[in-house]
Every structure is written in C-alpha cells, then in structure tokens.
Amino acid sequence: MVYSYTEKKRIRKDFGKRPQVLDIPYLLSIQLDSFQKFIEQDPEGQYGLEAAFRSVFPIKSYSGNSELQYVSYRLGEPVFDVQECQIRGVTYSAPLRVKLRLVVYEREAPEGTVKDIKEQEVYMGEIPLMTDNGTFVINGTERVIVSQLHRSPGVFFDSDKGKTHSSGKVLYNARIIPYRGSWLDFEFDPKDNLFVRIDRRRKLPATIILRALQYTTEQILDLFFEKVIFEIRDNKLQMELLPERLRGETASFDIEFDGKVYVEKGRRITARHIRQLEKDDIKLIEVPVEYIAGKVAAKDYVDASTGELICPANMELSLDLLAKLSQSGHKRIETLFTNDLDHGAYMSETIRVDPTSDRLSALVEIYRMMRPGEPPTREAAENLFENLFFSEDRYDLSAVGRMKFNRSLLRDAIEGSGILSKEDIIEVMKKLIDIRNGKGEVDDIDHLGNRRIRSVGEMAENQFRVGLVRVERAVKERLSLGDLDTLMPQDMINAKPISAAVKEFFGSSQLSQFMDQNNPLSEITHKRRISALGPGGLTRERAGFEVRDVHPTHYGRVCPIETPEGPNIGLINSLSVYAQTNEYGFLETPYRKVTDGVVTDEIHYLSAIEEGNYVIAQANTNLDEEGRFVDDLVTCRSKGESSLFSNDQVDYMDVSTQQIVSVGASLIPFLEHDDANRALMGANMQRQAVPTLRADKPLVGTGMERAVAVDSGVTAVAKRGGTVQYVDASRIVIKVNEDEMYPGEAGIDIYNLTKYTRSNQNTCINQMPCVSLGEPVERGDVLADGPSTDLGELALGQNMRVAFMPWNGYNFEDSILVSERVVQEDRFTTIHIQELACVSRDTKLGPEEITADIPNVGEAALSKLDESGIVYIGAEVTGGDILVGKVTPKGETQLTPEEKLLRAIFGEKASDVKDSSLRVPNGVSGTIIDVQVFTRDGVEKDKRALEIEEMQLKQAKKDLSEELQILEAGLFSRIYAVLVSGGVEAEKLDKLPRDRWLELGLTDEEKQNQLEQLAEQYDELKHEFEKKLEAKRRKITQGDDLAPGVLKIVKVYLAVKRQIQPGDKMAGRHGNKGVISKINPIEDMPHDANGTPVDIVLNPLGVPSRMNIGQILETHLGMAAKGIGEKINAMLKQQEEVAKLREFIQRAYDLGTDVRQKVDLNTFSDDEVLRLAENLKKGMPIATPVFDGAKESEIKELLQLGGLPTSGQITLFDGRTGEQFERQVTVGYMYMLKLNHLVDDKMHARSTGSYSLVTQQPLGGKAQFGGQRFGEMEVWALEAYGAAYTLQEMLTVKSDDVNGRTKMYKNIVDGNHQMEPGMPESFNVLLKEIRSLGINIELEDE
C-alpha cells in the first residue's frame, strides 16, 4: 500500500485478514445526496422543487380564461455564511426566485387564442440550505433532519392472526396505501362477508364500491366466480362436468355414465376417480333434480314472453323456480361454483348484505359515510367519489407505490398511473379472496421491502408542496376576480404561506432535531439515524414488539445493535456502514457477485426484495487464491434463513465483515466477543463522550477511526495536493501542485480554522494544525485536528492503565477508582463553553438600559465591567458575578410632597429603576472568552459595541489583506517565471519593484499574452479584494435584525474547565460503565515490580455476568501495543541506529497470520522512520476490525514481542503497605471515555427559594432551584420509626406551612430556636378540591 507523507507519520497496525474489496462510502451521503436532489434543477421534473412546481402549476382560473404557468426557478446567494448565521442567530438560507408566466386567453375567440402573455420573476420565500456537513442552521442553531422509515405506498395483504374475534378465526384484509390521498381497506368479517373502509371510517359492504364503479350484480358475479352449467333435457337434469372440481367432495349420488358407475353414493371422490373420469373424457353427467336446490343463479333469468324477471342473479334456486325456468324455455341454467375448501361464496354473500342496488344508491351510501349529516345530491356524491381515488390532485400512489402495487399483483409493468383504475380495485379484491381461499400468502409489514426511507429532500419537497397548494387557492381567486390587464404574476403570489410551511418543517417538525454535537461520532450517527416515529410514522405507544424487533432483512441495511434503550428501542435505528437508498427509497446493501463458483470483485447493490431470490455467503467464508470457495458446504443466507449450501449454489458474497453494523458499533474492537446488550450500551455511550483537552488516539481501534474523523467534517481536509506554505493556529495555506491547478488561478488554497467555539452540547470546538511548514500534502490528507481527533483519527477518550481487582470496596457495584495522576496530567480535563445572553427590551415604562450604573451594588461587584456595563474578555468570574449590568424602569410609586421636593432639588433618580443584570448562574465559574453585542437598527451603539465592531473590521481587513498577499505572491512568482523565460535578466528583475514588472513588454508574442493574462488576473484580484472588504464592512456595521421589542442583545461566552472528580460517569467501549468513587493518591495505587502505578482500578465482577469479554481482550492487546511502544522509546533514548529501529518496527508490522496489511519500511527514508518511531513511542496503534480481528495467538505473539508475559497478568504490590497481592492481576491499557453526565451539572443544593403557586411547596429540580422531595414512602419510613416531631416539621414548616416557615426564619435570625407548626397549604387545597365536588367541610375549633 502507498502511504502519503502525512499518513506515514503514524500507521495503525491492522490485524484484518479479509481483503478490503469496497472502500467505506462517504458516511454523510444519505443527507447530502437527498438534499442535492431537492434543490438541483431536474429537467425530467421527477424530484425536488421542480417536481413540486410542476405538480401545482399551471394554475387555471375557474372560467378558464387565464392561467399562471411555471417557467423555471433559481436559488440566490445566501446573505450570511454559516458562521455568521450561527453568531447572529439567523437561518442559513437562500432566496428562491421563480419565473412565472401569466397567459390570458381571448374570451370570444376559439379556444386557445392567446390575448396577452406576461412573464416575471417572483420571490417565493427563503429555502434553508444544507451546510457541507449535512446540517441546517436554523435561527442560529445547528439542526439535523433525521430520515424516516415509513410504510411504503402500495397494496398490502395482512391478517389479524386470529386476535380480533373471540372464536380465534383469522380475518384477512387488504390495504391500498397511496403516497397522498385516502386509504382504501378491504376486510373480511367473522361471517366471511367482504367489507370496505375508506380512511378507516365506518365499514360498508365491499360490493358498494363495485356498484359505484358501475358494475351490476351479474357482472360482479361474473368477475369473482366460476360457473356450473346445468342443462334440462327430456325432463332430466344434466350437469357439465369438470372432474377437477370434484376432488375431496363426497358423492351425494351415484356418478355414472352409460351405465358405468364411477363413484358410488356416499364415497369420497379421490384423485383416482378423477383420473378415470378424465380418461373416459366425460363432459356431462346426469344428476338428481334435488341437486340443483340451494345452488345460486349466476345471471338474471327473464320470461321472454312476458318480460317478467323470474330469477334475479345471486338468488338461490329451488325446485319451484327450476320448474318455472323450464316452462319459460330456459333449458340452460348457469350457477355459481362454490365449495367450502377453496371456492368460498364470499362475494355472493356480501351482495346479500349490501343495501344498495344501483350506482346512485351506492354513491349516496359512500357520501353518507364520508360526510355524515350532509344532505347528499347526485352531483356532490359523484364528485366526492371521483375525487377520492381517481383525481390526480387528490390522490397519488407515486412511482414507488405503483411499482409496489404492480409487483404485488404480479404484473409485468413497473410504471403506470398514479391514480387507481377499476381493474386495480378488482384485482386487489380477487387476490384478497384468493388468500382467504388458501392461495397465496399475506405480506410481512416489517420486511424492509415494505418499508422505505424518506430523507430530507423528500420531506422538504412535501412541505414545499403543501405551501404551494395553499398559494394555489389564492391565485385561482385572484385570476377570477382581478383585472387581468393590469395584473402581474407578482401581485398574485404571496410568499408567506410557502415560507411558513418550510419554516415550520425545519423549525418544529418532530424529525428536525437539535444536533447531537458531543463529539464527531455523535454528529455522524445523528445524521445517519433512521426513525420510525414522526408525521406519517408510528407512535411510541402504539408500536408493538414486531416493529421494534430485528428482522432478517436488516442484515447489512440497519444495525441490529445500535438503538436507544427505553421507550424508543427498535423504533430509532442506525444505518449500516455500507447501506444506501435506491431510487425508490428502499435500503440496499452491496454484495460481491459469484460467477461459476468464483467470487469476483464486481459489486451489486441489492434491496431487501431482490435479496430474497439469492443465496448469499458470509464475508468470513474461506476462499483460495483464485477466489473459489475452499469448503464444499458454505454457510449462507437465503430467504431470510441461514443454512448450509453447496458451493455451486452460491450467488453472492458479503462485501465486508463489518457490513451488518453501524458506524458506532464498528468502532468497538472485539465486538464479536461482547454480549449484544452490552454492545448496544457501548455503541450508545461512545456518542456521549466529551472531547478531552488533548485527544489521545485509541491504542486498540478497529480501523474505522480515520473514516469517521474525516467524514464528520470536524477536521480540515486538503481539497488539493500541494506544499504547506504558511501555518499558524488559525490558518493553513497550501501552495497547490501545478498539475492540480485550474488554468488561470493563483494556485493557493487557504484553510481558516475554527477556534474555541461552542457546540450544541456546550462542549468546545477547536481545530489545531497537524502539518508543519514545507510539508507535502496530498488530496484528502488531514491538515488540522478538530475536537476528539488525533492526527486525523477519531479519539474520544484516553488510554488508561487499568487493573482488574477489588480495592477496599471503592469499586463496589461498578464504581471506579482513579489515580490522582490522571487528574494531575489533565487526562480527562474538558472545556465547556456556555453562552449567556442579556436582552434589553423596550417596556411599557420605557426602555431597559445596559449600563454600569446599577442601583445598590457595591464597587467590588462592578470591578469586572467596563464603562458600558459589559464584562471584560479574560475576566475570571464565579457564581453570582455580574456579567452585563442592566436596569429596568420601575412603575412610578406615589411620592409624598417631601420626597418630591427632595427629588426636585437633588435630581435623585435611582429609585425608579430596578437591577435586572445578567449574572453568572450558581455553581458556575470560568473565564470570559468572548463578548458580542447586537444592536437594533436605529438604536445608538454603545462604546463597547463600537470597540467590538472596530476590532472585527481590523481582523477582517487583516485576514483579507493576508489572503491577498498570499495570492499576490503566488501570482508574482508566476509572472517572474514568465518574464525570465521571456528573456528578462533575473538580476535586473530582482532590483525592479514588483508592481513595475507588469509594465515590461516581451518580444515573444506567446509569453507577452501570458503576461497580459496574469496582469488581468492581478487587477481582478485587487478588485475582488476591494469588493470583499466592502461587503465585510457592510455586514459588520449594519444594524442587526432583532425580534420585535428587543433593543440590544449582549452574548457572553464563558469557558469552564472541568477536571474529573468523584461522581463523574466514565465508560469503556464495551458497555462497561461506572461512576468514579474516589480519586486516590498516586502512592496508594497498586503498582508493578518497576514501581509503575495503575491509573484506574476496575471491579473484575463487572465482567463475567455481563459477558462483555471484549474489554479483557482489549486490555491485553493494549498492553502489548504499549510494550512495543516502550521498546521503541528505549531504542530512541539510546539513539540506536535507524536500521535497528526500522527492523524492529518492521517485525511488529509483519506479525500475525496472513494479515492483509503490508507495510514496507524500506520505502521510508530515515527521517520518516524516525518520525514514525516518535509517534509510536507511546504505544503502537492497532486496528482489529469487527468480526475479523486479532486472534488469541496473535495477541500472545505481540505480547512476546513487547517483552511482556503472554498471560496478560502481572504481580502487583499494594501501594500503601508495599505488600505483594496474593494473585496475579490482569493489567493492561483500556480506552476509557468520560461521558457527558458530569456531577457539576447534576449536584445542587437549596436553602430557601421559589415555591409552587397552588400548593406553596418548594419547586423540584435543579433548573427551578428546587428542594428535595420528601415523598409518600419517606413519610411511611418516619411513621414506622415513630419520629413524630421530625415528621411534623417535614410536613409543615419545611414544606408548605406559609406562616410557620416565615416565623421560623425570623426566630432563627433572632437566635430563638423554637418552631410553631400551623396549617399546611396543601390541606387547604384538599378542602377546596372537596368543596368543588359540592361537599362542604368546615374545621371547628374544639
């Protein structure tokens, strides 16, 4: 493998055995591709905005004399970039401008004669844009739109599994689900009649819908039944015989022909009898006359002479009727063929319960069901029915729905109309009856072929269409009412409803979520999440076990491990690593094609439906060099089941061992040795890890770390290769390679880094360069690390030296004992940034004022504020300190004449304002790192605001001019090259000032042209610079768009440094979580024979019952990695020859059985080897991919190479006594995470505070500054102990005895420790509640 210069800095040893056939895809593509589809112009009009416009336009007026047509649309440029939107608290969006054409037709002239055409571009609101990382900035906060897994449109056949009716009879049903429009359900009742429901309303007999479709009883019977034909000849009754129909029946008479008896009366008819009848080719047999009684007529029989209806269709025949029919000349009688086995009389029975007889009565019945209480008219009833399923505006199956519909009914065509046809409805009913008759199967609704993914683009398009439909109504009315000569398209379109619909979706939809931004992994996982909840999905309460369960079709599409614990389990899932959606929105996963027993590298993506037809081998199946299967029998999956198949039956093979898991689960090394429940916790807890001060790559990883770090977008990645020309903490400049430049550009890429900004979870986002000056970089190399990344690899926690042993009860029940060294070295110190805002409003009594002149506040409290009343940057503040001084006008109080006089003399004004300053919340302390002031347009800016503005302008100018200098230098170096090659002497040129170079003329025409081009570029560059600077200045100096009534907002950013402390929650990656119980002095920790103490002591009892053995293997492998690092470190210290170093590192990389990774250190220069060694000396990072990781033997080999015992256990000594522990202890390096459940955020205490209004009891919870709840059970405990006085004060003065508690407070102040309990307020509430029931209770004094 070829490594780039940057990748050579640190190579992770990979234990993977299987070749990597397919690279890990870009992990955010599900979001980006979907949104791209939504906003890009689609000439076919299938997707996105184009599809929405085409479905609503053209809008015709009611009279048809004019119409508004859609031509095209374009998205403008966003006003602010992403960072500016976040700072200002606005939405990152672009204006949508649509070109519309108003066409007016002549009234009197023939149809289609155009009178007037007007075209105009109309503004249609703002469309939020997606950032490069797949998020949206809405009102200044980053949000993610989660994809939804919903039931695919189409037709589904299902049964109630015998749960509805008490008899346990299985009732079948069919449901036609459109993409938009009314649902149509067909269902059987316990009596086997078929009913229909529209939109889950009251059920009607199913034949009503057929009558409404203009079918008569005769036609209905013709559609659903086969016929039995009787003929009357010579007063004998003969029946046309189809022998097949007789199977399994009992003969009720002798079946004979020409005197030969085939079946005797009372015998069961078998296949042998049928073969005999068929052999003799018998078509007619004579039957007794009674046999026809009870059969059902298949059509109407009319007396030809009188026109009288003798026997209507669907009537049971009797002997009298037979005689009548015979008399009126009907010699051939058609009856329905039914039996109990597989030809039920369902439709015939349904017609009998159907109250309607013709189309009109059927339509009226449907109208009454849909609109109860409204009087039906023929026209209204017809319109309603037409609009339900046959109108393109109201009903749409969508392409997916039509595809699923046709596939379900086994039709060949995949495409078709979006509305239903008569044939569609009849075929669905026929298939449902077939299923009831025992032919065919019901569908599995949890199959991923019946559930599809709706991503951002599609949901945004639907919301946009909703907005457009609202506008459509208004436009129709304007077209009909307005004066068409003066009307322009602009006058008809109101952008408000459209932007309101879009804004509502992005701002408050259940699927638009506040981004989980704890660390890069939580961002990626959030964007790859798939939810079954949300509009048009399930609800938590109604979802049963089946929906939540792992389904065989999840394989390679949805992760079986990563899902939340609690009420949402199984409803919220995560996309598997390689999964993607196909054009219809179904999840598909890649497989390698197997041709003639050879596994090729040809990749096919299969959806769940297609996969069912193939035999698929697992990724860990053994292959030989040619790619043939080694074993004759191979474990494969087929039709959702796993079993052994011979190797020539195999059609496909999995692409990778980590194909079935999600990104989160694929980061857990030795996942294959963990119990699934613990793996679930491990995958979920990695998302809660807080980025530490210095990221530390995991010694034991899975090889996915780099992909996650790069794709998450928190790192700066080189867009093009080149050389590092300049680097500082906030900017990296790359001089681009010649071959990657675009013609006629300066060839400079500038990367500005994010410094100390706040994430959604208040953690710190900061980027640090990891390249040095002059280094070569290639496209895709990581230039700067973000939060929780180390040299471009995900690094959520720290490698800790752990020992598994009990330690004086400090690790009882999952507690964790931590060494003081961990705190001293700041291993788990994290930075949290809080944003505190102070809003100055315009009140009824006058404007609030931000000022340092606050009444009744001492000098000390104001010491950290400047003259504008805003805190200085860099000030250290603690709980209760004033950050922004603000005063609010108080209502005028009635003044006495004396006070009025004094006020007139001394101008004393302080008493009419009250202090409403922004203070630091209790229990928070930290450093102010930034202050921002936003002022409304037209309000005078204070001194601090002007200072900040000045500073921002300076910074912007500096940034831009530096950028200009860099680009200029690049240009001038090219001009220099052209001039020198054109014959100008270099020495003379060096003496000439740069800006005069362009005045020189060259004789070589080609060179002169090049020079002129470069000169043009130079002018353009300067012009561009001026433009950018002007735009920047305008943005900075313009007033801010604040909410109504707000004059000023001051935002203060407070950085809090939090060290690890008892009560913080920590976890490994295997679901092994615990709370820190004690920080132990270093000298007391257990240590080995060399005196190296351990960092963390974990309880060995946390392992066996939880079956997460992965943590033990990780610990051993981590020890080996560290051992090798220490050996390299020793060699570096002794300044060994590079050859020796190279040889040792090479041995470490080559270790293992047929490992796929090949590292050849002979291709590395000595400097590169030394730099690699520098980066390996703290431990050699190792990758052990999921299901394809290091084997026990390999771990032992590696331990041996590191000079460590292969058991992974060593002798420890007690740090307090120096005594040796009795047994050897497992010691090694485990990757530990600090989770975002910090004791500082949870611990809280209250003495006095706020009370609930009704009950007068203290509030609860930290946010309300509440008290401890002394609940029902605690009261029982005191009662049981007979602690009467304690109980009395708990229920009175400490809770809601209002007078008692104020008196008590006074007494304590006076030093008198007495208490007099009174009446608790909650007792009064109880009395009031009883009175509200009309029962009077009065308390009488004895």
From Swiss-Prot:
Which EC numbers characterise this protein's activity in its record?
2.7.7.6
Can you tell me which family this protein belongs to? Belongs to the RNA polymerase beta chain family.
What organism is listed for this UniProt entry? Enterobacter sp. (strain 638)
Choose any GO biological process term that the UniProt entry carries and state it: DNA-templated transcription
> Which transformation does this protein catalyse, written as a reaction?
RNA(n) + a ribonucleoside 5'-triphosphate = RNA(n+1) + diphosphate
Keywords of this protein's UniProt record, alphabetized? DNA-directed RNA polymerase, Nucleotidyltransferase, Transcription, Transferase
**Which HAMAP family does this entry report, sorted A to Z?**
RNApol_bact_RpoB (MF_01321)
Q: What is this protein called?
A: DNA-directed RNA polymerase subunit beta
Keyword Repeat assigned to the entry: answer is: no
Q: Which Pfam families match?
A: RNA_pol_Rpb2_1, RNA_pol_Rpb2_2, RNA_pol_Rpb2_3, RNA_pol_Rpb2_45, RNA_pol_Rpb2_6, RNA_pol_Rpb2_7
So what does this one do? DNA-dependent RNA polymerase catalyzes the transcription of DNA into RNA using the four ribonucleoside triphosphates as substrates.
The domain of life for this entry's organism is Bacteria
Q: Known NCBIfam families for this protein?
A: PRK00405.1 (NF001616), rpoB (TIGR02013)
Recorded GO molecular functions are: DNA binding; DNA-directed RNA polymerase activity; ribonucleoside binding
Quaternary structure (record): The RNAP catalytic core consists of 2 alpha, 1 beta, 1 beta' and 1 omega subunit. When a sigma factor is associated with the core the holoenzyme is formed, which can initiate transcription.
Any single Gene Ontology cellular-component annotation: DNA-directed RNA polymerase complex
Listed InterPro entries = DNA-dir_RNA_pol_bsu_ext_1_sf, DNA-dir_RNA_pol_bsu_external_1, DNA-dir_RNA_pol_su2, DNA-dir_RNAP_su2_dom, DNA-dir_RNAP_su2_hyb_sf, RNA_pol_bsu_bac, RNA_pol_bsu_CS, RNA_pol_bsu_protrusion
